[in-house]
Amino acid sequence: MLSVPALAAESGTENLVRSKTYTGQFSDLPEDHTFYKNVAALYEYGLSVGQADGTFGLTAPMTVGQTVIFAGRIRSLYRTGDPEAGPAAFAAAAVSQKDAWRVYAPYLWYLQSEGVLDKALDDCLTQPATRAQMAHVLANLLPEEALPLINDSLVTQGYASRRRITDVTEYTPYYQDILKLYRCGVSIGSNAAGSFFPNAPITRGAAAAMLTRIVDPALRLTPDWNLTDLFSAEGAAYEDLVTIGEYIAAPA
């Protein structure tokens, strides 16, 4: 049975600091790219060094296991100040695992030992990750004091009206986790309707955006949704809402 390591440093947002400076390390990341700030932040927080060829791989898909690795690093950074300290405690136990599992297991077991990830994805670590699976990996990564629900009311209203995030229903895998990312400012969707595209594969660029919004409050977003018409009658009296017509008696 795996033992849970004792971690010396106190956990907290004060551990989420940028320890590096991004100076163009990724050859495929122009400064005007949508995810430039996110990918640069991922490097500066010590969460990624990119791919072997010197690129970040913005449009490349990610496996479920790779999302788990990034999540494990963030959790460890929050808990210890070191993105690898937590998973490292499980590295010896992972030596007996085969192939990619040997790489993924320390991060997976670490997250599970922390109680922030279940076993739902254990059998698909080598498969391409969907955006819904990414949401499941991230949803409980930090406590609410570190990841507050800054958009709770707006997202609740937009979703309940079925005018926003319409491609996510109660039958969508991990739909509660997806909605939590909206409530926390980690996602605002991919179009004006706030669509999440839960079954689409997550790219490394889109993943970088979500990951760094988890870590850095300054990168979190609020949807630009105008829902005022939903409450245009708030405070109105009944007689203001109902047009009184002419009385016509029923025929005898």
Predicted segments, located by residue:
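Feature responds to low-complexity, polar/acidic, surface-exposed segments characteristic
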Residues: 2-34, 49-65, 72-105, 112-132, ...
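Phosphate/pyrophosphate-binding loop motifs in nucleotide- or prenyl diphosphate-using proteins
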Residues: 46, 185
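C-terminal/domain-terminus segments
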Residues: 203-210
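Mature N-terminal segment immediately following signal peptide/propeptide cleavage
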Residues: 37-45
